[in-house]
């Protein structure tokens, strides 16, 4: 194949994939080294739609809400680049004879086929212009019931950002009205949303799994594997957990019982939209967990941090974990881990604190303490918020 002729005035956006963009035309260079590698795709709401009416029970549809991940893989077949989705995974490492047969049984789903337009020294060039407008992968369509939207009326790409480990596609999308659902009480509203979709390279080496036990109350994901010498696929469950590993240089110290810092710490960032007076309590809620990690041999394993006001710290960067304040009448909070279902590894998390959670906390406190406190002061509210966020962490 010949090198495609790119316009001299095209904007070049470096990153996981090099992007060439001129006007509305967008080309990607898929590196040969990334063919066959697995990637995660997450969708984040950057600006939610304003609605005249919204149910107090609506959990999703706010700035910062993240959905996914979906596991995708690029492959080259018959002079085409094929995008596939991995929807199931069976660990065949214990079976030396049936692994290939099982791979056929668990065949990935083909999502898109791209003509190879040309090549660079390290990769193949494909046109993704129309594909990036498709709301089935780059929009909210797969999550429409959760946020109460109809079919997509219009969508356009507004920006593409690149990092060495990811590419972020930002878009504006308009959705038709939908009849009343549990997610919304609004009827007849056409809504506009700003989204960020992050395609991120997953680690080459899978994390070692930890099988679940009914005696220990961890959250889990389904897992299938084959044992050596067996022809049976065993259905099991593995624990959702962070990849906390001892650095090679600290192995001896760790085995002697000394506290060591993990190779990669857990960092959870507080969104700058979080009200300033509550920030100290939220930071403490995260950092309180260090005492528990020390019992596993790790010091400074987790840190709550205020998000810096810099370009790389955005809500749609799926490498980052966030605590976000939601202007919602819902009296609650929630924490969602985003998990690699192949191993149970937590890739990132999103913790939401709804504004009206303070109504619930006030009611709880008064119901349990009666008139022992004369006023529900900010300092008391902050300590109760710290309890809630610690629970979600």
Where are these regions (language model features)?
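Stable alpha-helical elements in mature extracytoplasmic
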Residues: 278-285, 381, 385, 389
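Active-site recognition of the HExxH zinc-binding catalytic motif
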Residues: 287-290, 344, 386-393
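Auxiliary tRNA-acceptor-end handling modules of aminoacyl-tRNA synthetases
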Residues: 6-274, 292, 301, 307-385
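Sec-dependent N-terminal signal peptides
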Residues: 1-3
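A short alpha-helix/helix-coil micro-patch that ends at or immediately precedes a cysteine
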Residues: 281-299
């Amino acid at each position: 194949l010949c090198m495609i002729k790119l316009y001299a005035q095209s904007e070049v956006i470096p990153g996981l994939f090099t992007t060439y963009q001129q006007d509305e035309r967008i080309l990607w260079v898929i590196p040969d080294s990334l063919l066959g590698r697995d990637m995660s795709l997450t969708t984040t709401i950057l600006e939610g739609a304003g609605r005249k009416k919204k149910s107090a029970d609506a959990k999703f549809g706010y700035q910062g809400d993240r959905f996914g991940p979906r596991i995708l893989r690029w492959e080259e077949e018959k002079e085409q680049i094929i995008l596939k989705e991995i929807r199931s995974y069976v660990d065949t490492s214990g079976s030396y004879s049936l692994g290939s047969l099982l791979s056929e049984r668990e065949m990935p789903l083909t999502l898109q086929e791209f003509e190879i337009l040309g090549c660079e020294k390290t990769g193949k060039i494909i046109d993704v212009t129309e594909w990036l407008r498709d709301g089935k992968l780059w929009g909210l369509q797969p999550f429409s019931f959760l946020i109460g939207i109809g079919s997509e009326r219009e969508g356009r790409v507004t920006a593409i950002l690149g990092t060495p480990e990811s590419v972020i596609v930002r878009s504006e999308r308009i959705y038709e009205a939908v009849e009343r659902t549990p997610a919304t009480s609004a009827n007849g509203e056409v809504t506009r949303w700003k989204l960020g979709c992050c395609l991120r390279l997953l680690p080459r080496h899978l994390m070692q799994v930890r099988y679940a036990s009914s005696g220990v109350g961890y959250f889990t994901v389904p897992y299938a594997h084959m044992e050596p010498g067996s022809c049976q696929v065993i259905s099991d469950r593995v624990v959702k957990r962070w990849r906390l590993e001892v650095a090679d240089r600290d192995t001896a110290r760790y085995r002697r019982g000394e506290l060591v810092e993990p190779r990669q710490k857990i960092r959870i960032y507080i969104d700058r939209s979080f009200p300033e007076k509550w920030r100290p309590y939220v930071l403490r809620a995260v950092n309180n967990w260090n005492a528990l990690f020390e019992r596993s041999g790790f010091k400074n394993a987790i840190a709550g941090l205020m998000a810096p006001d810099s370009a790389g710290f955005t809500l749609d960067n799926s490498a980052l974990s966030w605590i976000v304040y939601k202007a919602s009448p819902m009296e609650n909070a929630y924490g969602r881990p985003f998990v690699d279902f192949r191993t149970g590894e937590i890739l990132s998390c999103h913790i939401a604190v709804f504004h009206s959670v303070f109504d619930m906390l006030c009611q709880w406190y008064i119901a349990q303490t009666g008139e022992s406190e004369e006023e529900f002061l900010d300092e008391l509210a902050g300590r109760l918020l710290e309890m809630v966020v610690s629970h979600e962490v």
